[in-house]
């Protein structure tokens, strides 16, 4: 069985680990709410609207990590991603089932680097110095990885005039299988 802490309102499939999802037909990307519909969130515009919305409901939408945000400077990204040089831009260029980021393009003074896989993306953008602001207003620090790869990235200009990146995120974990907080939310509603 596969499980994770908190969803973003959607789940992913086994493709997040580079595995053929057809080998695991029971791991389907679905909504974490009644009806469990499968929505296509593979387009950045559709996913950006979804992850930035505070109106999405799910069995675990009341949990703090259902939605979160953080800021990462170009200096921090430059130090963590080899080969790009001084980072000037970052874009999600591939999305897997449920909208999870599967490919990230990082452009800089020395060229463009592609980061592939949700785990690699979470590690490349995570840093213990990051302050993750949870939807309940509380913060979390000290994690070497992003909480999840269900992310949308908005380029901004930092106080130093350099590019910075605001990350809108949702959920905590890889997003495959059962959301533990989703299951708890179902139990609170009297569902089996």
Identify the meaning behind each predicted range.
Residues 1-192:
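Conserved, single-site charged/polar hotspot
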């Amino acid at each position: 069985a596969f499980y994770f802490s908190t969803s973003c309102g959607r789940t992913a499939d086994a493709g997040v680990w580079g595995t053929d999802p057809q080998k695991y037909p029971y791991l389907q990307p679905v909504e974490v709410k009644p009806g469990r519909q499968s929505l296509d969130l593979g387009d950045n515009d559709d996913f950006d609207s979804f992850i930035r919305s505070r109106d999405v409901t799910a069995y675990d939408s009341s949990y703090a990590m259902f939605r979160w945000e953080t800021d990462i400077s170009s200096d921090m990204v430059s130090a963590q991603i080899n080969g790009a040089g001084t980072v000037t831009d970052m874009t999600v260029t591939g999305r897997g089932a449920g909208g999870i980021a599967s490919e990230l393009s990082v452009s800089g003074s020395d060229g463009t680097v592609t980061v592939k896989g949700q785990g690699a993306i979470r590690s490349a953008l995570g840093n213990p110095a990051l302050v993750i602001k949870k939807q309940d207003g509380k913060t979390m620090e000290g994690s070497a990885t992003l909480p999840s790869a269900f992310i949308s990235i908005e380029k901004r200009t930092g106080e130093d005039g350099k590019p910075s990146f605001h990350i809108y995120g949702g959920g905590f974990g890889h997003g495959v299988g059962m959301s533990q907080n989703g299951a708890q939310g179902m139990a609170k509603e009297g569902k089996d």
